[in-house]
Curated annotation (Swiss-Prot):
Species, as recorded: Drosophila melanogaster
Residues linked to a glycan: 189, 312, 544
Disruption phenotype: RNAi-mediated knockdown in Akh-producing cells of the corpora cardiaca results in a significant decrease in combined glucose and trehalose levels. RNAi-mediated knockdown results in defective muscle patterning. RNAi-mediated knockdown results in a reduction in the pale ommatidia subtype.
Protein's name according to its UniProt entry: Neuroendocrine convertase 2
Top-level taxon of origin: Eukaryota
InterPro entries according to UniProt: Galactose-bd-like_sf, Kexin/furin, P_dom, Peptidase_S8/S53_dom, Peptidase_S8/S53_dom_sf, Peptidase_S8_Asp-AS, Peptidase_S8_His-AS, Peptidase_S8_Ser-AS
Signal sequence bounds: 1-21
Amino acid sequence: MAAATWSWLLAPFLLLHWASAGAGGGAGGSGAGLSGPAVFTSSFLVRFRRGVDNSFAHDVADKYGFDNLGPLVGADGHEYHFKHRTLPHARSRRSLTHTRALKSHPAVHTAVQQPGFKRVKRGLRPAVPAIHGMKFDLKVGEGNRIDEEPTDPYFPMQWYLKNTGQNGGKVRLDLNVQAAWAQGITGKNVTTAIMDDGVDYMHPDLKFNYNAEASYDFSSNDPFPYPRYTDDWFNSHGTRCAGEVAAARDNGICGVGVAYDSKIAGIRMLDQPYMTDLIEANSMGHEPHKIHIYSASWGPTDDGKTVDGPRNATMRAIVQGVNEGRNGLGNIYVWASGDGGEEDDCNCDGYAASMWTISINSAINDGQNAHYDESCSSTLASTFSNGAKDPNTGVATTDLYGKCTTTHSGTSAAAPEAAGVFALALEANPQLTWRDIQHLTVLTSKRNSLFDAKNRFHWTMNGVGLEFNHLFGFGVLDAGAMVTLSKQWHSVPPRYHCEAGELTQPQAIVMGRSLFWEIKTDACKGTDTEVNYLEHVQAVISANASRRGDLELFLTSPMGTKSMILSRRANDDDHRDGFTKWPFMTTHSWGEYPQGTWKLEARFNSPQTRHGNLLEWSLVLHGTKEAPYRTLHPSSPHSKLAIVKKAHEDKKMK
C-alpha cells in the first residue's frame, strides 16, 4: 500500500497550488484502494500549454488515435481527458509510446496515463434479492391532500419515514418527514445527482422526477446513465438510492421518496473495472448549476486497512463545487460514511472525512448502530438503514426492471435519505449555502433513541452544549425541524482557515504510555484569518508504526472536548508507510472557541509490543470570526440553537 498522503484539505492556497500543478499523478499517495501491482488505464490527462477549445483538443486526440472525452472541471481549457481507442482498459505497465506521441505535439505540455483504482458500493447484498413486482393502489388519482399519509403500497414498510414500531422498531424513531411535508415542503425545484452505477430512469416511480439535462454516463461517455443489467442484480444500487430521494407519491407504485417532488439526475460512473481521477472529477463537477446535491454511496474499500481518498482533479472539482456551484451558494456533497464496521475508521476515508462533504452514518429501527457502521470524528449526522429484528426490514425503494425492494441497506441507504432531507431544506430556503446546510444539520439533528449496541461510544457534550456521539455525529436528521429553521435562517458569516501551529520534531511513541503534544494558539487573532467560532478542525499528521492499525490518536480542544481522530483498526498491518500529512478531521468541537492549548495524544492499543514515531503535527482551524447565530431568534429556550447562542453570548460578555 502506498503512503497515505494528502494535504488537500488544509487551506485554499494549498488547493490553488494543486490546481495549478494539475491533476495528473494522484494525490501523492495512497493507492491503497488497489490490490496487487499498479494498474494503468487507457485514459490520459493531456495538459495543453494554453487554453484550447474542444474542437482543437478533438483534432489532437484524433491525430494520435485517441477520443477526446472533454475538458476537466476547473482547468480553464488547459486539461482534457483523452481515451485511447485500442489500448486495453487496464494493464500493468505504462504505455510510453502513446505518452511520447501526445507530448510530441507542440501545443501539449504534458500527458499522463491515468492509474486505475478501486471504488466500492456501500451496501450489503442479501443472498437472495427480495425483488417484488409493482403493487397498485386503488386510491391512485384521488388527489390526496398533503396532510394525509401517502397511499403508496410500500409506505407502511418505510419505517424510516414513519416509525410506528414495525418489526420491533422504536416508535417515532424516524426522519420526521411528515412534519416537513405538512408545511408544503416536498423538494420542489431541487435536483439531487445519484453518482453511482446508473439510474433506471424509465422506472414508473422515477421517470416523472428524472432530470435528463443534468444526467450523464461517464462510464460509457453518453447522456444515458442507464444501468448495465447483470445476472446478480449488482447494478441496482443507484436505482435504489434514487428511489429513496425522489420516488413519486400516491401513484400506487413502490414507496415514496423523502423529497418526492424533487428531481433526480443519474451520473453513471461506478460501472467499469477501475476508477480514474478523471472520471471522479468530471462526475463531481457535472452541471454544478443544475444540480444542487450530489449523493455518493461508495468510497475506498472498507477492509479496515485501506487509507485512501480523492486524487487531485477530484479534489479540485469538489472545492470548485462548494465555492462556485449553485451560482455561488455551493453544491452539497453527501457521503456514506462506510461499511467497515468496528474494524475500520472513516477518518481513513478521505471522501467521508473531508470538510467539504457531509458524512452520514446509519442507525437501525430500534436505535442502535448497524453492525457494519464505522465510527469516526468526521461524521456529521445519521439517518437509517436496515431494521434490527427482520433482515428483510431494510429500506423499501425502487429496483431494476420497474420493480421494488425492501432489502436496500448499508450506509449506502443512509446517504440518499440525508440528500432527500437537504432537498427539503433547499426548497424551504433556496438561498442556503453549503455551510448553512452543515450548520442546520448540527443544530436540528436529534439524539433521539440512538445508542451504541456494544457500549463503546457514549453521548458527550462539547464546550458549547452540543451533544455528539463518535458513531452518530450530532444525531439523526429531523426533516421537520430542519425545514422550520431553514425558513428563518440567515446565512452564516464568512469562513476562515487558520493555520494555528505545528510541531515538527519527531518523537517516539512508547508502548504502554501515551505521547502528548501540545499547541497553544490564539487562533490567528488580529489577522485576516481570525477564527473565534469553530466548524471543522484538522490535525494534519505524519506518523509511522510497526503496526499502523494499533495506533490510536486523540485530539482535545481548549474547552476540553476529546475527539478520537483515529481508532484501532485490527486489519491494518501496515508497517512501512504510516501516515504522511494525513488530515484527520473532527466536527465534535463545532461552535467552540479555539483559543488556548490543543492536545494531541498518540498511543498503541495492542497486547503485543509496538513502536513508532509521531513525526509532525499541524493544527488547522476552520470557522468564523463573528458569532454564526447572532441574527437568529430561537423558537425554544431548550433548542440547540438557543443553547449554543447563549454560550456564545456568555463568552462574549466575559
